[in-house]
């Protein structure tokens, strides 16, 4: 079968009689229809024409008629589409021939000029009119679908109503999710005539998927296989030298900047966004160079890139509402004509001009107001001058009216002036020739009215005193003017149920001129101001007196005393010094026979037994020439009192001056006299001799006077600051000299035939063998018996004690048994380990060596928890923390009871008062110098700190201890160190952790400041951590600077360790946690 090269499709179907097949498609839209016809031309006899053509014809109306016919022609070079209407036959040129649609053919195509005459008006064969296209014979043929009017509605032959167009919305046969049985139960969903659709729902299908045409320019998504424009690239034009027009604008304009904004600050702000800028300029007023708050800048790079960066920067600033110095940043891109910049400059200049005009107006107002004030003052001055003249004239009249020793009667008596005054004798010492007002008792009775009531009534007047008397009230004034004013205004005034009639009296010795001149300046002052001036004057007088005392003291100590001491120097009076020394030598020689006789009587005893016998007899007390205090063995009745701290006058001022410059810890701390302990006690004979001070002194003077004098000088120089220790060391040296002298004067006795351990001693009786202390838990074995029994006397005593004891064991060979017992003990490895008289128990099993020898296991770090078990200063962790201890606690207790230093300990309030005086002295010295210097800078915290010291701690390494009791809430010490920034502190912390130092000495003050006491700091850095601390840290301001100060949380005893809670942040990693060693009852176990 051959195909026709031309095929036409019509919806509704139908074949034409000339071999065409046509179908027409109609849509069911109301507003528009899509009408297309696809036509392929095939040769009727089965031959293929070699070409295929398609013709698209669309109409906007559903009722538009389809094309009647179409023709297609082709040649080797082109394709031509032709449409023929029903009005006449259409001709298609094919080679030399021509083809007509109605079937007629001609041999040759007619020319344009002959076509009209060659075509007949009516076709002879078909009978069709060539002009109208109407064939009267059409009615004789059968009407096919091809010959129907396709513009009319097609009638359907199915079940559905043919009058309604429809669309299948849902077809169960096409639903793959349903089974065959379910498909039979479902029905089709059909929509008729586009129901439920409105006009606005009809959209262009090309825009329905994305909503814009941008999808046609971008890459298609994975779901779509459509390539509308095959990814056409967007055009980008780069500005270069050949480009036309202005370049892309990349200049930024910033306006309304605060006046405090600097160019460097703004440049750094722009750089913080990561883009480098150039050509940053601040625009100033050209007239007076005042900043207008406008700046311009450009970004670096080519014009296109810099424009993109500028637009991005402006968008970020507007989104984030960026502020500079509290003002929101206003920014925009300048145009090519600088129109934006010129507008902003003009607005800024207008604002500046308006502000300048406003300032000028305010200045004019201020000058006008000032001029008015000056005019007012001038008028007041003139008025005061006039009043002064009038007052002077009035004073002249007063002089004639008010005279001494006169009395002006009350208004009741018409103010009559009479000579003489009434003044009781006992009140004269209070009034002292001053004017006064007398209120008689018959007008205001003193029994019913008190002086306080009179004071309240006359409160507005500057009276001095109100003196009650049985005759009446006397109101005393310092000024005659004030007295007259009170008399004129208050005379005859009603006072309760009485009338207050007054009499103004002037004493006989009253001097009006002195009184008026002394009170002219204070006339305008009120009574409250006068009282305030009195308080200030009194305080000034007190300060002046104190300053005078200090000045006199300084002159006495720094000027007069050195001159007097120089005048009294021994070098200026050599003859007098020699005479005094000769008198002392003569006195010592006169007393020497008595001393030698006494010594010989004492030293005549040959051995220890005789000395023991003498001990039981009462000793004769020899006469004393000079008594010396505070010897160690001065008797039971005498207490160990410290010698008074006496320093020679010629050195007193020097040491007083040096003590001010010494460490303040020593100044605030009470001094305890050093009491040296002798290694062995002296014998009763020697002690009895030493009890008498006179014998000892005379022995030293007679035997070795020069040596004694030399030793005193050396000791005095070395212990000049502690006279008690000076005297004690002097006493020790004197005792040693006495012992040496006695040993030299004693008779020589030969003890060579006696064993050394049995030879007699001269100091005190002692056992032959040293006693070994024993404990109840010690086993009494063979070694213990051998250590107890030393000689034949001990064995004899032991045999006597064990005579009644019978042994039940049968030991044949005693030596073998003894050797066996010792061997068993040695093999068992039982060893007695003692330290500080305390037996240490066996070690824990975790300390056992795994390899059998600790040397083979190498070195390892011992944890702090294990160090507590064997280190002496760590073992005190469970005892009251008192690490600072003296060599002899009992001796210190005795010294504390005998030497009462309570007078030397000052309270905190007194210390602060002394520190304030010292600070005032420093400020006065700085004012005298007249220049600022760091030498006299005073840190008030160093004067308020408590005496503390550092020592080995029971908690960890070193600790800080209190040297005296500290009350709660008192300041202890300042945490001193190097003040650094936060960034530097982080860097140092990392370096400290790498080197193993740790970061426990870094103390934060605020967000930006940290105090580092690792390498530069005070002793406060030794304070240890404790979960139950005794101190706390506070940050205070001293002279405008922040300081870290340690305060006491509770009462702290002397020698108690100071602790503080470090407050580390808790670590989640167990490997980084630090174990706490404080040992407090509420210990948390870890620092962090």
UniProtKB/Swiss-Prot annotation:
Keywords: Chromatin regulator, Chromosome, Methyltransferase, Nucleus, S-adenosyl-L-methionine, Transferase
Motif (RxxxRR motif): 912-917
Residue sites binding S-adenosyl-L-methionine per the record: 1062
Domain (Post-SET): residue spans on this chain: 1072-1088
Main location: nucleus
Region (Disordered): 1-136, 179-217, 365-406, 510-531, 624-747
Single annotated GO MF: RNA binding
Every SET domain range: 946-1063
GO cellular component: chromosome; Set1C/COMPASS complex
Compositional bias ranges of the Basic residues kind: 705-715
Extent of Basic and acidic residues compositional bias: 365-391
Biased composition (Polar residues): 101-136, 392-406
Subunit (UniProt): Component of the Set1C/COMPASS complex.
Family designation: Belongs to the class V-like SAM-binding methyltransferase superfamily.
Protein name, as recorded: Histone-lysine N-methyltransferase, H3 lysine-4 specific
Organism: Debaryomyces hansenii (strain ATCC 36239 / CBS 767 / BCRC 21394 / JCM 1990 / NBRC 0083 / IGC 2968) (Yeast)
